[in-house]
Amino acid sequence: MINHLMSILISIFLSGYHGKTTDFAKNSSCHRTTIAHFLNSGKWDDTLLENTLKSSVVEIIYSEAQRTGNPVFCIVDDTIASKPKPSSQALHPIEDAYFHQSHLKGKQDYGHQAVAVMLSCNGIVLNYAFVLYNKSISKIDIVQSIAKELPEPPVMSYFLCDCWYVSEKIINTFVQKGFHTIGALKTNRLLYPSGMKKKLSELDAELSVTEKGFDPVTVKNRKYYVCRWTIGVFFRQCKTRLALDTYQIRSSKGIQRYWLLMSMAHYICVIGTGRYQSFQEGYQLIRSTIQQEKYQYLFQCAKSSIDFEAFMKLAG
């Protein structure tokens, strides 16, 4: 199990990585089908790894909040891992892939939709959950379930989201856990100030006239809400560096296991090099270290003229 995990994690930091089983096999003595079996149906406890990763993320973020007094931000959004539309004759299409409305592309996009939850404090941003949305449970229920499992933070904290996740159910669940919601609202949303039904656009117009300096989106001069943008950066990193758009795994279980290892790679980049740093800094450091060790081994092989088979494998 450890050898397969390491083969996958190391391959992430090598040139030409696309999340394919052939990429994983380049760093393993096993055939690519063996590694595919490990992801799709291998008997290993991915739930234990997931819970361990979640506990570590909570410990790091909550400890930072306790140390600095800064709020914890729980940030939620979703994205689509785009995949090619399958042929009508496909015998084994990718599981749990559907058409979803892409706001980024402005059209329907085929692939897997993921709901991501990030925890952040004082500039440290870590992925807490990356959940496959397969239409068997609503995204609102997914987020509510995650909110229920979070421990109460040591300081006043905030749940940041866009208008899709601003619902009574989610707001109430998060406030019970010590998180106040800061989120976007659709202008046609109905509110009941003083028991009177009003559209948000109407209330905004009234308060803009009656309340000096009223701004419906101002919270700490917008300093808190802009922290939500880090999840967009995370999605972009997953797609450009961690092969979220290009992995080739067919089974639903294999996909969720791959996403777990993708989150683990992000975690390693941020905290695994001996100090907290951005994902990009950690990624470049680990990648350059792997390359340096590879070239050092190549040099030693050439110098001593031993292990020629290993030398040729690395050189190729």
Identify the role of each PLM range.
Residues 1-4, 104-110, 248-259:
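Structural motif
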Residues 1-49, 53:
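Gly/serine-rich nucleotide phosphate-binding loop at the start of the catalytic core
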Residues 11, 41-122:
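Active-site-proximal, Lys/Arg-enriched surface segment
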Residues 24-25, 70-84, 117, 159-166, ...:
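Short, conserved catalytic/metal-binding motifs centered on acidic residues
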Residues 80, 222-249:
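Short amphipathic alpha-helical "interface-anchor" segments enriched in bulky aromatics
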Residues 244-299:
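Basic, amphipathic alpha-helical segments enriched in Lys/Arg and hydrophobic/aromatic residues
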Residues 292-316:
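Charge-biased C-terminal accessory regions appended to nucleic-acid-, cytoskeletal NTPase
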